[in-house]
Design a protein with these regions (language model features):
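Short coil/turn linker and secondary-structure boundary residues
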Residues: 59-62, 84, 186
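Phosphate-binding glycine-rich loops and adjacent basic patches that engage nucleotide phosphates
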Residues: 26-39, 76-82, 100-102
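Short, solvent-exposed cationic patches
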Residues: 67-90
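Globin-like tetrapyrrole-binding proteins
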Residues: 1-20, 86-182
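A short, conserved beta-strand element enriched in hydrophobic/aromatic residues
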Residues: 29-66
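Short N-terminal edge-element motif at the start of the domain
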Residues: 4-38, 45
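Single conserved hydrophobic/aromatic residue that forms the stacking wall/gate
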Residues: 183-194
Length: 194
């Protein structure tokens, strides 16, 4: 797993040596960015393939010291919230390999982060005081239709994350949705009535 760090995160980590991305599959790459939203430090953790976004606040100093472990535990917790089993989560992390901090994963990924930061400025509610995981903000950001790097079509990040899990074989493929056509009676304007 690669955890991309923007300049703001690199400064907070107090590191000068960050590796280039080694070309891991984007579904195993998460880019991170630290910014202020409504007067609080918010860490965005954004999947490079599907733009699924996790918003965290009040990062404790020890979490910065063990950054890769912290990010993995956050992703693990959010996947649990989404309904994935321990076996499925374990499979994801096993497939992702060793965790390293790298530079971000391209212009499109950074553009996605910038979009999330801009959208977060318009979030109409206050951030939860006692919660580190800002669930409502994350849900708000994951309802923004987009076409991220890992997909040819537009979609919502939360749906695209599920599709990535299906592509990896971690989640079972859902049946295609049935389309119901609404039948209306012919109208004289249709020219079908004589």
């Amino acid at each position: 797993m690669e955890i991309g760090a923007t300049k703001a995160v690199q400064d907070r980590l107090k590191t000068t040596k960050i590796e280039e991305s080694k070309g891991a599959s984007l579904v195993f790459c998460w880019d991170t960015h630290l910014t202020k939203i409504k007067g609080r430090n918010v860490l965005f953790i954004v999947n490079a393939s599907n733009r699924y976004t996790i918003a965290m606040t009040d990062i404790e100093p020890r979490n910065w010291n063990y950054y890769t472990m912290y990010i993995r535990s956050v992703i693990h917790g959010v996947m649990q919230e989404m309904g994935y089993s321990e076996e499925q989560i374990g499979q994801y992390f096993k497939m992702s390999g060793d965790t390293t901090v790298t530079k971000t994963h391209g212009r499109k990924s950074v553009g996605g982060i910038n979009r999330m930061v801009m959208d977060a400025q318009y979030f109409g509610k206050k951030l939860e005081k006692e919660a580190k995981y800002q669930w409502e903000l994350s849900e708000y950001l994951n309802r923004d239709i987009c076409q991220p790097e890992g997909f040819d079509a537009y979609g919502y990040p939360n749906e695209l994350f599920k599709l990535d899990m299906e592509r990896l074989g971690i989640a079972t493929k859902r049946k295609p949705a049935k389309v119901c056509l609404l039948y209306t009676s012919p109208s004289p304007r249709d020219g079908l009535l004589s």
